[in-house]
């Protein structure tokens, strides 16, 4: 699901072309109900790319390097779940399984618990954050889920606003 930030889709795109009122934006945002939003693992705002940046040389991680890291993380997950019926990756694992067997450090668990209380996360939301944190740890080639992995997963959990 990729909702626009406002009815016209131009809010925060840097062009200044959005003519939506604050009430329009609020009304539009409310269309995504709590239960629906709770089922979205990651909220990421992707800004408009300037035309000049499309051909610019970048020092960012290359697509081939990202592909390699994702492939390696998927291999780790396949090995992790080889004895768990019907599960081949973190997204398909039971949240309780990851909580019990996913290498979550005590600091990470404490941070997630504080965040769950402070953000009023549902059980589903708690486990989705945990699954994303486990995936971030896999991308970092870490055997354990640290508080930093949980903190990053929590940043993706919160809907962004412009």
PLM regions with names:
Residues 1-162:
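Basic, amphipathic alpha-helical bundle interface domains used for macromolecular binding and assembly
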């Amino acid at each position: 699901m990729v909702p626009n930030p406002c009815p016209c889709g131009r809010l925060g795109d840097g062009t200044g072309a959005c003519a939506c009122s604050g009430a329009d934006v609020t009304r539009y945002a409310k269309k995504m109900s709590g239960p629906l939003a709770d089922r979205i693992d990651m909220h990421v705002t992707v800004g408009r790319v300037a035309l000049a940046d499309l051909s610019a040389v970048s020092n960012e991680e290359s697509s081939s390097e990202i592909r390699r890291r994702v492939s390696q993380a998927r291999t780790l997950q396949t090995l992790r779940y080889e004895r768990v019926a019907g599960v081949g990756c973190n997204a398909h694992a039971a949240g309780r399984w990851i909580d019990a067997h996913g290498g979550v450090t005590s600091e990470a668990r404490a941070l997630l618990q504080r965040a769950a209380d402070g953000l009023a996360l549902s059980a589903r939301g708690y486990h989705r954050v945990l699954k994303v944190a486990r995936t971030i740890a896999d991308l970092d080639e870490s055997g354990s889920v640290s508080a930093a992995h949980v903190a990053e997963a929590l940043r993706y959990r919160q809907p962004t606003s412009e």
